[in-house]
Amino acid sequence: MIEVEKIINEFQPISLNEMDEVKLMSRNDTKFAFRSSKLPQLLNQMYPFYRVLSIDGLKIHDYKSLYFDTKERKFYLDHHNRRVNRNKIRFREYVGSKLTFLEIKLKNNKGRTIKKRTKVKKINEHLSEENKSYIKKVIGHDIEVEAKQWINFSRVTFVHIKDKERLTMDLNLTYHDKNDKGDLKKIIIAEVKQEKMSRKSDFMRIAKQLSILPIRISKYCISTLKLNPVVKSNRFKEKVLFLNKLISN
């Protein structure tokens, strides 16, 4: 990790205000998962093409998230069953910038991710009436949800020096609920965020050279499955086997 931090700190910085130009609240996402041992080589090759978000001189930022779902885990099952127009609801604390939001993500029938959010004072395990009203406004109807699990990680956010592209890398991921806990600390989850899908991305080109290939993966769904092995999971089995192989190799 010391080597990784040293390489990341060599990247040219970009501020939050500058990054607003590539906020991409409606976007195409492409995810990747790979062993953390590949990170130094990957970062060195990315260096000429990307800047890194810097807040108060820090380029690695902690995120805390509390995910909500229905009692029957509708959001998890919608994802598992490949239903379009599906949602995720969470509180997320951006620790470094001291900001917390209630966030709602929609994956629409065109494969685009649309994120709506409203600022809140802190993460709450119980939704306030104001929270519920906001969720109804965004989703379009009332829905009863409850806190399910925490997912915490450190994130590095890259912004391409020329293209309208952002890239996040999540490190040291941990998850827990009231009964169990686990982690994916040996794995990096990267996500390319683009206005329009383009395989010409410098990250995608470099990743392919290092045999890092795209994978559809959800931190919420994988942690749900790990914490609740009895949930429906047949369509996620290949992904779980892939992640287990990354961890064990």
Regions found by a protein language model. Give the residues of each.
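Phosphate-end processing signature that detects enzymes handling 5′-triphosphorylated RNA
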Residues: 1-249
